Amino acid sequence: MIRKILICGFILVASSSLAKAQRDLDYDQVVVPQNRIDARDLGYAPVDVIPHGEDGITALTIAPNGNLYGATSGKRSHLFVLDPRHGYVQPLGYLPNTTAVTHAIVVSKDGDVYVGTSPGGHLLKYSPNLEDQQPLRVKEPCQVADLGPAVKGEGILALAIDREAGVIHGLSYPNAHFFSFTIATGLIKDFGVVAKHAPHGEKSETGKMVSRMLALDLKGNVYASGEDGFLYKFDKEKQVLTRLPMQLPGIPGREPWSRVDTFLTTPSGLIFGGTSDGYLFRFDPDARKVDNLGKPLLQYRITGLALGSNGKIYGVGGDKDDLARMFSYDPQNGTYEILGFIDVNRRPYYAWEAYVIGAMVAGPDGTMYIGENERISKLYLFYPW
C-alpha cells in the first residue's frame, strides 16, 4: 500500500512538472520563434556538467577553425569548447585561482586560447590538442600555462586580439589600465587609464565606469569607453592612448554613468555598440562620428551584439530582474524588430528561459551563440535564417 502511494505521488509530481511546460499557445507569440532557437547544457547532463554556481557564461569567442570557446564566472571559472561538427559543449576544466572571466577570452592565429582572469589578473594560455578525443574535465583543472599578471594588483576586465600583429589588448579593473601583450615576446606594456575617477552620487555604481568590451577597427586601432562616457582610442601606429571628443548617446546628464557593454565591428569598418542605458549606437572610426540609433528595448542594458549573414545586427538585452529579450536592427533601412524573450520550450519535456545574458557571438555559418549568466545557465543557439 505504501509503495502504491509513493508511485502515485511520483506520478503527480511528474505530471505537475510537465504541466508547467504546457504553456498557453499564446505565449509563443512573445518568445523567439521556437524553430530558430535551441539550448545546450554545459557538458553531458546530468552528471558531467559544469556545476551550478560556476556556470554563468561571461565570455565567448570564435576560433579561426570555427570552434566556439567560452568561459564562465562564479565560485570557480571554467573553460569550455563547442565544435559545431559535434554540437555539444565539452568542459575543459576549471581555471585555477579564477572566479571571473568577463569578455576576456581570445584565440590567436595559431589557435591558442588566451584568457584574462579575475581577481588575480593573470593571462593564461590554453593550447588545444585533439579535444574531442579527450575526457570531459569538470572537477579537474584546465591545462593552461600561466603567463603572469598583466597589471599588478588588477583584474582583467576585457581582452581583444589583433591576430595578424600577434598582439592582445586588454583593460584592467578596478583602475581601468589599458595594456597590450605581444605574443611572440611576452612583453606587456601599460599605456595609461581610460578613467581616473568614479562617478559621484550613484549608490548602485561605486566603481569607475569603463567599457566591458574592447573593439578593433580594420586598421588595428582599439576602442573603449571611459570616464564621463567618452570614447578612447589606442592608435596602433603611434602606440598612444587618447580620449576622443565623442561621448556615448544617452539622457543628458547621465554621461558619467554610461559605458559600453558590448561592441561589434562589421566588415564595412563601422563599429556598433550597446550601452549600459540600453542605447544602440554606430561609430565611424574614419569620420570620428557617433550616431545614436535609439533604444530598441524599454529596459536598460544591451549585453550582446552579433552580425547575421543576412546583414542584420542581432542583439540581446534587458534588466537583470526581467526576462532577456532579443532584437534585430537592419542597417539598410534603420528598422528594429523585437524577436521576443529568449526561451526554449520543448513541450512536454522541458522549458528554459533566460533572464541575464553574459555574452553573445556569431559563428562562421551564421549561428548565434548566446551565453546565459545565472546560477544555473545554458548556452543558447539562435538561427537567424
Residue ranges and their predicted role:
Residues D48-G53, G93-N97, D146-K152, G192-K196, ...:
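Surface loop/turn motifs at the tips and blade-to-blade linkers of beta-strand repeat domains
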Residues D55-A59, T99-I105, G153-A160, K208-M213, ...:
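Repeated scaffold domains used in trafficking and secretory/extracellular systems
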